A protein has these predicted regions:
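Short beta-strand-centered aromatic/proline hotspots
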Residues: 48-60
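Compositionally biased, intrinsically disordered low-complexity segments
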Residues: 8-9, 59, 128, 148
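Contiguous surface segments at macromolecular interaction interfaces
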Residues: 64-150
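Beta-sheet entry/capping signal
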Residues: 3, 34-36, 53
Length: 150
């Protein structure tokens, strides 16, 4: 499996999260400081692995080419933008999945497809999630991408 975000590097999309759905525009209006990214591990429908946390910025990446109707920009070089390096263990997948399933049950039932995969996390949920993952190993986002590219 290709490491997360490698296709973004290859297509010049680092620093951009986009979607054609209006749900992303609604989320952008809430002025988020951070975006969390997750994947469903292969063969583990209904489970989530946290991949990264990116610091939101108003600045477009220098090489930004619009691909979607709505975009969020993140600062890939910020020390606050990280990739989680040990979040793939069964225990951590279960921790993340249980925490979020209790709060976003409908999204889990739809397996996070389409708009159901985009959710605002209220401050109390963010604080709890940050506490949950605070001891997970991380690497600065761009350093992690460089490692993934070899």
């Amino acid at each position: 499996m290709k490491p997360p975000f490698v296709s973004d590097v290859n297509e010049g999309r680092i620093g951009t999260l986009g979607a054609d759905t209006d749900k992303l525009a609604e989320l952008r209006e809430r002025l988020p400081r951070k975006v969390w990214t997750f994947i469903t591990p292969k063969g583990m429908k209904g489970k989530l692995k946290v991949i990264g946390s990116m610091w939101i910025t108003d600045e477009r990446p220098a090489n930004f080419v619009p691909k979607w109707r709505h975009n969020l920009f993140y600062d890939a070089a910020s020390p606050k933008s990280v990739l989680f390096t040990n979040s793939g263990s069964p225990e951590k997948i279960e921790e993340v999945s249980s925490y979020l399933n209790n709060r976003f049950n409908q999204a889990f039932r739809s397996n996070f497809h389409g708009e159901k995969g985009l959710h605002a996390m209220e401050a109390d949920i963010v604080r709890g999630f940050e506490k949950l993952v605070r001891d997970y190993e991380t690497v600065q986002f761009m350093e992690g991408i460089k490692e993934a590219l070899g």
